[in-house]
């Protein structure tokens, strides 16, 4: 590395951001650019560690350790320290088709496995990645690169989320004709409608890449659901191969008393409608408003956090986020050693904003809803909760048990269910006759991605289950490689 003592000389520093109480008044991204000289010193903190773990992409105890797409992190950190930004961008694009997406929304498992992080705060890998690609766009270094020749092969990609876009980009580079089917009115899937604008700007960031893909020859067909608007049987007739990237969009429900009441919605319905109204410039459009309401969000993951941030920007009256798991410790527990993902207490952007407005972290840990209470008009007015404790049953599995005397009633005119996803929607899979695994995901081996039907591949959450955007990138690229091998007999596409 260019600065072997950088990790000793420089402290970890993250970019400045707009204050929570001011940024909730708009839908803009709130992280501010870091000056290049500061980025160079942050890159200099990357150690000459001998065996980097940051780019390993290994699964440890069900969670990612290191970058799932094997980003060449030490290489581009060194190049940034030396001021060689264009070369750093080239290194970044070798493994990541869309670093502006992961640089904004990835939880950065690379930082959790950074060797420096064993004893000191890790290198700010995520911010450096985002800064490299943002500078690339600003300097005009990111340009459409259509393939110089075409193979004549046609590939259909079903779904334009992160896995679908990576598969499309890679297969288009290989020279195949790519058609991406998307049932929404805009391409992008989760990136367009599932992640709020303040985390990932749709017009300035997402649409920019979509435009580039179109300029490179990728064809997007929106408002088209395969199986309804486009006959399923035509897929295998009209295309030489098919890559399914439909996501895991079936939400987990909460079938307790009062579930049928008005005002109880799945989180993704809330987030999608909000972003669509924002993009359509429709203040009075068909979206679910939290304005002036007591909001209860059930679920403590990223989607729940996005519901927190969105509700605050609507102008909610109050906000409580129920989390069934215990509050994590402030530091790594002994059974959570490096290089595992550190399971520690964090305040994400949504909780920071809620604390700024209401005075405290909105999360209520070890709490579950037991009943929804309605008014005389059939609208939810309160959520009944109880504190739980995790106890082992006879099979040795931990199950939640209610603690007597801890019952509470929380006022709520809007309840958002953000408890994760159960898997892909089944009608298209049924129509194709695809085999599925025990979790109802498409059956296709990791690394091969081939389904039970020759020429049909699966990638992303529809194959692996609910996961991170960066894992979708990994699978989209991998499926593209195997699809290209199927079409041509061999492949030059990287993993």
Language model features with spans:
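Beta1-alpha1 glycine-rich phosphate/pyrophosphate-binding loop at the start
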Residues: 5-16, 20-32, 40-44, 57, ...
């Amino acid at each position: 590395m260019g600065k072997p003592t950088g990790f000793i000389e420089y402290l970890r520093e993250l970019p400045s951001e707009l204050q929570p109480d001011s940024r909730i008044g708009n839908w803009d991204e709130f992280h501010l650019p870091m000056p290049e000289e500061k980025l160079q010193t942050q890159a200099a903190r990357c150690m000459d560690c001998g065996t980097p773990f940051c780019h390993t992409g290994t699964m440890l105890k069900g969670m990612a350790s290191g970058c799932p797409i094997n980003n060449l992190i030490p290489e581009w950190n060194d190049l940034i320290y030396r001021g060689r930004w264009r070369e750093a961008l080239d290194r970044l694009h070798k493994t990541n088709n869309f670093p502006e997406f992961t640089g904004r929304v990835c939880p950065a498992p690379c930082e959790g496995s950074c060797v420096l992080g064993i004893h000191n705060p890790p290198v700010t890998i995520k911010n450096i990645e985002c800064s490299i690609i943002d500078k690339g766009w600003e300097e005009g270094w990111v340009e459409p690169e259509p393939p110089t020749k075409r193979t004549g092969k046609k590939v259909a990609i079903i779904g334009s989320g992160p896995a679908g876009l990576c598969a499309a980009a890679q297969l288009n580079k290989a020279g195949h004709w790519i058609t991406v089917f998307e049932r929404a009115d805009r391409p992008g899937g989760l990136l367009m409608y599932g992640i709020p604008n303040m985390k990932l700007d749709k017009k300035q960031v997402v649409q920019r890449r979509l435009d580039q893909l179109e300029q490179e020859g990728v064809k997007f067909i929106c408002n088209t659901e395969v199986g309804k608007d486009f006959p399923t049987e035509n897929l295998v007739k009209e295309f030489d191969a098919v890559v399914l990237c439909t996501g895991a969009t079936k939400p987990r429900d909460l079938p307790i008393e009062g579930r049928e009441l008005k005002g109880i919605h799945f989180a993704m319905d809330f987030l999608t409608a909000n972003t669509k109204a924002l993009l359509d410039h429709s203040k009075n459009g068909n979206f679910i408003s939290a304005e002036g309401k007591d909001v209860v969000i059930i679920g403590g993951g990223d989607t729940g956090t996005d519901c927190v941030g969105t509700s605050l920007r609507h102008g909610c009256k109050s906000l409580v986020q129920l989390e069934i798991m215990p509050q994590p410790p402030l530091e790594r527990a002994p059974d959570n050693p490096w290089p595992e993902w550190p399971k520690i207490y964090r305040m994400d952007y949504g909780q920071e904003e809620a604390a700024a407005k209401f005075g405290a972290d909105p999360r209520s840990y070890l709490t579950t809803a037991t009943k929804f209470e309605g008014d005389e008009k059939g609208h939810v007015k309160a959520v009944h909760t109880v504190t739980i404790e995790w106890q082992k049953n006879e099979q040795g599995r931990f199950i939640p048990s209610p603690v007597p005397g801890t019952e509470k009633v929380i006022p709520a005119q809007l309840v958002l269910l953000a408890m994760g996803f159960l898997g892909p929607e089944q009608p298209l899979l049924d129509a194709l006759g695809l085999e599925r695994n025990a979790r109802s995901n498409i059956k296709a081996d990791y690394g091969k991605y081939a389904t039970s039907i020759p020429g049909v591949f699966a990638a992303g959450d529809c194959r692996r289950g609910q996961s991170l955007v960066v894992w979708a990138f990994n699978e989209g690229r991998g499926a593209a490689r195997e699809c290209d091998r199927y079409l041509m007999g061999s492949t030059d596409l990287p993993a």
